Amino acid sequence: MRLILGDQLNASHSWFKDKDPNTLYLIAELRQETDYVVHHVQKVCAFFAGMQQFAQALDSAGFKVLHLTLDDTQAFSDLPQLLAHLIQQHQVQCFEYQLPDEYRLRQQLAQLCAQLSISSQSVSSEHFYLTDEELPRYFSQGKKHRMEAFYRKMRQRFAILMDDEGQPEGGQWNFDANNRNKLKAADLPGVPQPLLFTNDVSEILKRLEKHQIKTLGQAESSLLWPVNRQQAKELLDYFCHFCLPFFGTFQDAMTGQLKQQGNNRQWSLYHSRLSFALNSKIISPQLVVNTVLAHYRKQQEQLLCAKPRIDLAQVEGFIRQILGWREFVRGVYWLNMPEYASLNALAANRDLPSWFWTGQTKMKCMQQAIEQSLEFAYAHHIQRLMITGNFCLLTGINPDQVDAWYLGIYIDALEWVEMPNTRGMSQFADGGIVGSKAYAASGNYINKMSDYCGTCHYKVAKTTEKEACPPVSFLVPARHFHFSFCFGQILANKQASRVNNITRQITISRWHDIA
């Protein structure tokens, strides 16, 4: 019996090179996975729909598949109990599984296998650029690593965007300085409509209601996210043709104007929205990177007459996210778990405000980011890092609560990728393992990269007045703070000085640009 987890929907895995009538593939919906954190309802639907379609695809290809829904697994408290039952029921002689990408599941399965009386084996998921065995060559427990150095090594090793002399294509490694543009009014008409799918998940929603699965966010019987390989490849192709030409230019931009105009494109902009398909392994990072590169090369060779032309900065910015950040945070996660999950370098201990689950706040930037997340189970990286994450950092929210919120609300959130991004990059709770500084910013940065501030109840230019940006009087009675004032509180916090003299390390993101 071979176990396939919900984030292991990899049709290219070597398991599927040959068919064996004596091998049973198990795909199962479990309360254990719906309940370890409160998930967005679209996230649960997407994983369950993806699992169902993968099971059907395997069955159609001639593999022996057992697909169990919540109706079938409700009697089992956890995965080991279900597996033990099925091993006995089907008289299984050997149990195999792909190594989970989450510490919790990897420990759980290792403990189960240690108790089994039959043979067992774990194999690679065959998804990432770096195997598990290779990670210690790039990462060490507790050591502070820098993504840029790692990214350059990855570019060199896999010969991606490198010239014949072993130098970075275009003469530089990073074009991030070119990718900080705000969407002006004249840019808005050109923002593409997002490619949306119409996957019927009404039966899954009925199951969630029947089993009283607690979720958050807006439920939709027609799921817009890709849940099979064909849809994921279609979305990738759409990205290359319609989003890639301006991906880098506007990757940090935010706008609420499109929604006000009755055209709901502001949540997707030029982003690929491939993260769910990638993190569920419906498609591979190699396929994504190679497809983007092939599209870029064809245009360079004038085999494609697409307009506007795609320049190197757009391609490099996108590949950096896949080859760089995605592989980087995975390495940080595995070389630092389980200790990483409890790090709290800034001793942050405040509770997450209740309006994080409703979006009912007068702060326009927070309202936009949270309402969008509740509606689509998605926000792009700057909304996560510099809006909601920035707020939590500056106001000292407990990183455990921040982790749980991010892990639950986003469709692409799995612990291996969420935790280093949230606890590390966003909250600096790891004391600098992921980032060299805390990514804190004032309202001026938000005003520079968005059009939120112009229609906000609060005034970005104010400091300590009642209408200052933003008020956090729920934390400190009768006081009103703006982002920069909160930042100053971090610098003055004596608790922070106990961690590598953190007060000297924290800097406002792009201070010279926004001062």
Description of each model-found segment:
Residues Q8-N10, Q74, L99-Q107, L393:
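Gly/Ser/Thr-rich loops at beta-strand to alpha-helix junctions
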Residues H13-F16, Y36-H39, S77-P80, L105-A110, ...:
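A short acidic (Asp/Glu
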Residues L5, N10, A253-G256, R265, ...:
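C-terminal catalytic domain of photolyase/cryptochrome flavoproteins
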Residues F63-S77, W355-T358:
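Glycine-rich phosphate-binding "P-loop"
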